[in-house]
């Protein structure tokens, strides 16, 4: 079974490398390491894992690191394939189709990140909020302060429907929480996450099933 699991892990790595080809290399790093640090895989990384990737200098380091990365998140190492990796690829593809913004891949946007970590929202809510807006005007003039309406989009997840590992994390942090609400500010060319960052951090930590590997 271990040999089969190792082969499955290598296949997952090879699959992911095809996604990394879409990343942008950074000076001093291989394209593989740059793709890891700058691409959608970073949404799944613990802070210490991101630091490890940023120190990589060879493709061999990146490939070895990836095998360990996915092995730590494999829900059943004795079976071929890795459901966590498979779900990740599917969600990246969906995010790229649905949420691209001003030339940015959908999987690298705020909504793409949430889709990758939590899945599609069972409930969507929309609202508006009036916020200050100002025009600087000419030098020496007072800025013209007005207000404008912005669109708020909320993604709602019932805690009872979350994966077991995430439910356990939430129970430790917020035992009375019934639903997670993530709120986005939606503008024509960009979307920003306003509320819910803590739930994404919990989801990242809950995805690590074998911390010691």
Listing of model-derived features with the role each one plays in the protein:
Residues 12-23:
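Bacterial N-terminal signal peptides
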């Amino acid at each position: 079974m271990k040999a089969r699991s190792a082969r499955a892990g290598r296949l997952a790595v090879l699959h992911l490398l095809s996604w990394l080809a879409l990343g942008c290399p950074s000076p001093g790093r291989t394209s593989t390491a740059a793709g890891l640090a700058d691409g959608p895989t970073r949404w799944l990384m613990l802070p210490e894992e991101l630091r490890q990737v940023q120190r990589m200098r060879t493709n061999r380091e990146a490939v070895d690191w990836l095998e360990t990365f996915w092995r730590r998140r494999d829900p059943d190492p004795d079976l071929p394939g890795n459901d966590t990796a498979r779900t990740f690829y599917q969600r990246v593809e969906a995010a790229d189709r649905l949420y691209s913004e001003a030339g940015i891949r959908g999987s690298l946007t705020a909504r793409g990140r949430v889709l990758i970590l939590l899945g599609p929202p069972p409930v969507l809510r929309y609202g508006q909020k009036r916020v200050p807006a100002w025009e600087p005007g000419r030098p020496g003039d007072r800025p013209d302060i007005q207000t404008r309406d912005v669109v708020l989009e909320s993604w709602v997840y019932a805690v009872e429907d979350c994966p077991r590992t995430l439910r356990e994390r939430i129970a430790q942090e917020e035992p009375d929480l019934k639903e997670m609400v993530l709120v986005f500010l939606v503008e024509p060319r960009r979307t920003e996450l306003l509320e819910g960052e803590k739930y994404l951090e919990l989801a990242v930590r809950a995805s690590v099933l074998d911390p010691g590997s």
